[in-house]
Amino acid sequence: MKLAPYILERLTSVNRTNGTADLLVPLLRELAKGRPVSRTTLAGILDWPAERVAAVLEQATSTEYDKDGNIIGYGLTLRETSYVFEIDDRRLYAWCALDTLIFPALIGRTARVSSHCAATGAPVSLTVSPSEIQAVEPAGMAVSLVLPQEAADVRQSFCCHVHFFASVPTAEDWASKHQGLEGLAIVSVHEAFGLGQEFNRHLLQTMSSRTP
């Protein structure tokens, strides 16, 4: 996948730019418990002052909140989407196909993922552990990727275009009708998982380099 290095660099750059790199993993692990996360809880876990948490969240404009101002979604969400992400008998959701391949390694849990082909509506499913994917149905499942934009709203600029497809040919036919998307690429689900693993390594290295 020739675009992989560029997609990876853009993804990591977006996280650096909006300041979410250090916040992402603790937030995901709290959301994975299946309940809203207060800013106070997040500040305590990160050992950050409340003002720093507020400043980072202000930059991450895609963040979802409940009516009380608690966080209910950032990549992993309590609100229903097309990407079902089940862990420990809890039904959660993700913003896009790539999220479902990235998050198990970051939260240290195996997830059962189910969705639909973005072109045909056919069901797709797989099991994603921190280190591998299994039970891929259909076996030829594919994923669409685009170059992430340098924008605060990563959900709108990237996630909304990253889908599962029942097969590579089906995805390529869909892509032929969406050529206006910058850097649009179709890859196998295994290639997408590999990209996600590489993103995780970059993210965790960034976090460890900032740890006193």
Curated annotation (Swiss-Prot):
GO terms for molecular function: alkylmercury lyase activity. The gene is merB. Belongs to the MerB family. Keywords: Lyase, Mercuric resistance, Mercury, Plasmid, Transposable element. This is Alkylmercury lyase. It catalyses: an alkylmercury + H(+) = an alkane + Hg(2+). The keyword Lyase applies. GO terms for biological process: response to mercury ion. The keyword Mitochondrion does not apply. Its EC number is 4.99.1.2. It comes from the Bacteria. Cleaves the carbon-mercury bond of organomercurials such as phenylmercuric acetate. One product is Hg(2+), which is subsequently detoxified by the mercuric reductase. InterPro entries: MerB (IPR004927), MerB_HTH_dom (IPR024259), MerB_lyase_sf (IPR053717), WH_DNA-bd_sf (IPR036390). It is an enzyme of class 4 (lyase).
